[in-house]
Amino acid sequence: MSVYKVIDIIGTSPTSWEQAAAEAVQRARDSVDDIRVARVIEQDMAVDSAGKITYRIKLEVSFKMRPAQPR
């Protein structure tokens, strides 16, 4: 039997939502093993006073949990 955990992560990029998502998943892979699915929950853009746009994306990421170690 498999058990999966789901977490929310947010990525940002000055380029695109796709880049924000890719960087968020790559960063999550640095600390979480066996990511299976990343689902887009929300997308938005932040615009600063100079008109610079930052693309932001919220992802729901699921990964397979390792079996518990015997105590």
From Swiss-Prot:
Protein name: Calcium dodecin
Keyword Metal-binding attributed: yes
GO molecular function: metal ion binding
Gene designation per UniProt: secE2
Function: Binds calcium ions. May play a role in sequestering additional small ligands.
Pfam families per UniProt: Dodecin
Disulfide bridge map: none
Keywords: Calcium, Metal-binding
Record-listed Ca(2+) binding positions: E18
Quaternary data: Homododecamer; 12 subunits assemble to form a hollow sphere with a diameter of about 75 Angstroms. Calcium ions are bound at the interface between three subunits.
Assigned protein family: Belongs to the dodecin family.
Cross-referenced PANTHER family: CALCIUM DODECIN
Gene3D superfamilies registered for this protein in UniProt: Flavin-binding protein dodecin
GO-annotated cellular components: peptidoglycan-based cell wall; plasma membrane
